[in-house]
């Protein structure tokens, strides 16, 4: 058995390994709403806390946790998340434009995705966490692997 998100007041319940709770209609509506929030944000990432606050449910954080486990939302960096379609697009666009060994700067990412410096930094952090780029020493640039 392992702990999985549930509604026992502590946010967890015991269930056989691999068990996934059935999504209630309320869960599905909340998950669809959260998905829309991240989709509409695009590359201007929304924090998980901010997205959860836009869902009118007391268990919004629990729903977000289940969506993370089900890989319906993806961590970009820290508390910032998006949906797989956006994260896939980030990886694809960067891999198409840059080759191994090339340096990528925050300014280039900012221009490529038409985002703020903060969101460009989150994209670089995400790419580093995915192992696609590595730190070069300068805070504002990474090198393609």
Question: Where are the regions a protein language model picked out?
Answer:
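C-terminal non-catalytic scaffold/interaction domains in large multidomain proteins
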Residues: 1-145
